[in-house]
Amino acid sequence: MAKDIRECLLEQVGKFHQWQEITYPGKTTEEIGGAWEVDYPAWNDIFDAFCHVLTQMNAEMADSVLLDEMVYLIARDNEAEGFIQETTSHPQWFECLCRRAAASNENEAKWQFAAYLPECSCSQEVRDIILDFAKDPNEYVSRRALLAMPALRPDCVEQFAPLFWERNCYSPELQEYQRIAVLVSLDAIHSDLLPQYLERAKQDGRSYLLEHAKRIEGGLAMNEKLSRPQFNQMDTTEKQTLMESLAARYDMTFLGLHTFDRWGQNCTTGIFKKDGREFVFVPGDTVTLGWE
């Protein structure tokens, strides 16, 4: 049974390889470039066979040939990301394929595993592969790894920040993207290093980097306003405006202000809705969003 499932997928991959060779004779995937894979007419057949392997075959039974071809397919599906999304629902397979991808030359697979590692219930050993992806020489692989690191290894973000900021091995455009990733990841972990990197971004002066720095600074200013003392000093209109800004920042729907008695004092809070669930913002020394 498992052999038939394996052979079915390998047969579909073989057809894809044949199509690739006929359509782009003598060229590697890097030499072809662009989103050439989307022109293949039988992606649905490959996807069905791929999903059948995930659901009907134990990952421990997979040999190197099957694993390599599955990593190859994930890499070729880098535009739609359907294969990697499906794989995240199968942690054993995700772990096997993530390890295989990390040891491969398939950059289009590596960045997807880096990006989707936070979405999968993997072992800590596999989650730590994010550190290897962050050291990858491919710019996009390393950048996606740094952006995912706050969810996986927040304790390591600060040690990678200088590396990403200072290295000059990429084009000026890609270096700017590396520095943007530093700001975003430091902001995600509320790092004490963030202010100095925001200042360095201003000194850098490139437009996209400045844009992200201003956006992050705006968020920091909002967090200051959301502390309880400042919040209490606002009138109702100011509170309403601030809550609407908070909703926009976190892609939520603001349902209105609510005043309640807490320890003998009147407290005002904001009620929000996201993904069909309502929750409350409670101003305090730091921003706290809690499900209700």
Give, region by region, the residue ranges found by the protein language model:
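Extended beta-strand/loop cores of jelly-roll/beta-sandwich
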Residues: 225-292
